[in-house]
């Protein structure tokens, strides 16, 4: 018998985030992420966080308030019970997320 793991994928155009407002950034970034973004308002940082959070939401619909998701790498894990992979190519970014099972051990 196979254990079903939930996955989420998001493909985002980085250039879509060039002229996004501070209000938009506050809506999708956690407080810690917003402070980091506010230093130089890097649109690729904003696009990356968007793609990751969209993928997390697609894997688990409980995470619909993006500002409550703080994405940072801590002890090889990005966010709670998720494995996250991100890749950039030109103007595109893709985020791939796998939700870990509760009984799955952390390495």
Curated annotation (Swiss-Prot):
Its EC number is 2.7.8.7. Disulfide bonds: none annotated. It is found in: Cytoplasm. It holds the Pfam family ACPS. Transmembrane segments: none annotated. InterPro entries: 4-PPantetheinyl_Trfase_dom (IPR008278), 4-PPantetheinyl_Trfase_dom_sf (IPR037143), ACPS (IPR002582), Ppantetheine-prot_Trfase_dom (IPR004568). It is an enzyme of class 2 (transferase). It comes from the Bacteria. GO terms for cellular component: cytoplasm. Mg(2+) binds at residues 10, 54. Keywords: Cytoplasm, Fatty acid biosynthesis, Fatty acid metabolism, Lipid biosynthesis, Lipid metabolism, Magnesium, Metal-binding, Transferase. GO terms for biological process: fatty acid biosynthetic process. GO terms for molecular function: holo-[acyl-carrier-protein] synthase activity; magnesium ion binding. Its cofactor is Mg(2+). Transfers the 4'-phosphopantetheine moiety from coenzyme A to a Ser of acyl-carrier-protein. This is Holo-[acyl-carrier-protein] synthase. It comes from Mycoplasma mobile (strain ATCC 43663 / 163K / NCTC 11711) (Mesomycoplasma mobile).
